[in-house]
Structures are given as structure tokens and as C-alpha cells.
A protein has these predicted regions:
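Acidic, glycine-rich active-site loops and adjacent beta-strand->loop/helix elements
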Residues: 17-19, 66-73, 97-101, 132-134, ...
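Conserved thiamine diphosphate
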Residues: 57-61, 107-140, 191-199
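Generic beta-sheet signal
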Residues: 60-64, 91, 150-156
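A short alpha/beta connector and helix-capping loop motif
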Residues: 73-98, 153-155
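Short acidic, glycine/serine/threonine-rich loops at helix termini
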Residues: 75-77, 103-107, 164-169
Length: 200
């Protein structure tokens, strides 16, 4: 069982019709303050929440997760410009950088690289990490909490489908649910990977 302080998630929750399905739904998942779907809208809402936090002198932080294909949307950069202008040091943007989107490799569709340099140009504090390494993820979140006067972008280099042999780095699994047999194999492989992580 995987869990966080906000949302306990069991492997069963990863089923296609469950609380862990597809896009996060704020009606069903504690800690999710906005349901997402249309690309680029999440960061705009996050910037608004971070501005509200500043106006209220609140000490909360706002986290938003973007796909690397999603940052092809102009709305992402409009929101980023405002976040930097407002010095939103209570905002952390995480970019899942796996180079795959529904149409194929993002480098072949409409490359946003170098992602880190683009966020730096918008005056973000940028942290590059291996997004499949939990220690690096933890260190990045801790570093982000120390940043003052500018938003943070964590550029997490990941492998899409990591831990499931037949899904790793395969664009065909973008938005596709496994059948019963594939699901069983995937869960077995993830259980083994999880056990190995716990032994570290």
C-alpha cells in the first residue's frame, strides 16, 4: 500500500473506476482543491490559489503537477509569467518530464526543451531531479520550501510506466487501461518494486 499524509492510496485504488482513476477529482480525493482535465488550466488555478494565500497572509503552499506535453499550452506560460511577477514563493510547479504524450514523443510533436531554461527565463527557481528517485523528490520539496521571492519549478525526469515492464516508455499506454490479465501482471511487478524500495 502506498500512502501520503493527505491521501492514503491502496493498489486497489489504481483500478480504472476508483478514487485514483484518470484525472484527480476534488469531490473524491482529499487534498485536491481543483479537478483538472483541460491542459494548462491547473497551473492557472494554482497561481490564483497562491495569490489568494499571499493576500490572506496564509502559510500554505500550492503544488501543481504538469505534464511535459501540457507545457506546450500557451496558458502555462501566461500563468508562469504572472507567478514570477507576483513573486509567488508559495507555489511549486512539478513538471513530469517523460518525453511522451498521446501523439508520441514530445520532441517530435512540439518540443518544449530545454524545459529548465524556459522556467529560469520566467524567473523560477529550478530544481532538476530524477523523478523516479524518491530521495531526490523529497530533497526537492524540502529545497522548494526554502526559496524566497520566486516560484519553484521541479523538473522531474521520469520514465512513463516505470516499474511495469510492458508499459515502460510506451506511448500506447497513455490513457489506456489494462485488461484483467495485464492489470494482474502490472500489480505483481509493482508489488515487487515496492518491496525492493522498502528494503533500501
Amino acid at each position: 500500500t502506498a500512502s501520503t499524509d493527505i491521501y492514503p492510496l491502496s493498489l486497489h485504488d489504481a483500478l480504472p473506476i476508483s478514487s485514483g482513476q484518470g484525472h484527480p477529482d476534488m469531490k473524491h480525493i482529499p487534498g485536491v482543491d481543483m479537478s483538472s482535465g483541460s491542459l494548462g488550466q491547473g497551473i492557472s488555478a494554482a497561481v490564483g490559489m497562491a495569490i489568494a494565500g499571499k493576500l490572506d497572509n496564509a502559510d500554505y503552499r500550492v503544488y501543481t503537477l504538469l505534464g511535459d506535453g501540457e507545457i506546450q499550452e500557451g496558458q502555462v506560460w501566461e500563468a508562469s509569467m504572472l507567478a514570477a511577477h507576483r513573486k509567488l514563493d508559495n507555489l511549486v510547479v512539478i513538471v513530469d518530464n517523460n518525453n511522451l504524450q498521446i501523439d508520441g514523443a514530445i520532441t517530435e510533436v512540439n518540443s518544449p526543451y530545454p524545459i529548465d531554461k524556459k522556467f529560469e527565463a520566467f524567473n523560477f527557481h529550478v530544481i532538476n531531479i530524477d523523478g523516479n528517485d524518491f530521495d531526490q523528490i523529497d530533497a526537492a520539496f524540502k529545497e522548494a520550501k526554502t526559496v524566497k521571492g520566486q516560484p519553484t519549478a521541479i523538473i522531474a525526469k521520469t520514465v512513463k510506466g516505470k516499474g511495469v515492464s510492458f508499459m515502460e516508455n510506451q506511448v500506447g499506454w497513455h490513457g489506456k487501461a489494462p485488461n484483467d490479465e495485464e492489470y494482474k501482471i502490472a500489480m505483481e511487478e509493482l508489488e515487487k518494486a515496492g518491496e525492493a524500495l522498502c528494503q533500501k
